[in-house]
Amino acid sequence: MERELSNVSVGDVTAAACPEDLVRAVRAAGVRDERVLRAVRATPRAGFVPAAHVAHAYEDVPIPIAHGQVTTQPSLSATMIEGLRLTGVEHVLEVGSGLGYQTALLARTARDVVGVDLWPDLVRAARRNLARQGIRNAEVRVGDGGQGVREHAPYDAVIVSAAFPTVPAPLVEQLRPGGRLVQPIGTGGREEVVLFERTVIGLEPRQVLTLASFVRLHGRFGYPS
């Protein structure tokens, strides 16, 4: 029997908790982009977490999911998305979609999103969760995130939600010149979340957005699964 990863009703959450709690946390983390804040407000995280953790859906904390993974803390997702400086017209690649919450935020701030995750059960759950929220401009597929999704390239922006000491070469190749990429750089544990830009000479670091702890990037261009 397939394990149900995230299929809770928003009504199952205590009435005192709501997306506005996360909006306050995101503001407190320094995010000022109103489009990102509106996306957080419009996206019920309770629809994207395992049933066992729904009581914590509107706390600004990572939540454990299958395969030893955790969801990205909402304020950290918002910080990374703000770093991409999306205007609503971008074609975005997301590496590490999890259960789809960050995918939903991206879908509400970009033109469309292609998400990729290594585990089929997570991808199935993310697709269900996004469909229940009526989000139709996001596609999530199974794959090795470090290899990107070449058939939908080039991308205007890439967001990587797992750590590795370098940016995988396929992600650089699939990023449009002038495009932006955000990735935690490190071995998994405590990383610099770095904003890069692709220029005529290659991928150049522009800014360290924050420090944070991430799971490791697995796959051909990451750590062995």
Label every PLM stretch briefly:
Residues 2-95, 101-105, 109, 122-136, ...:
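Class I SAM-dependent transferase core
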Residues 85-205:
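Conserved nucleotide-cofactor-binding alpha/beta core module
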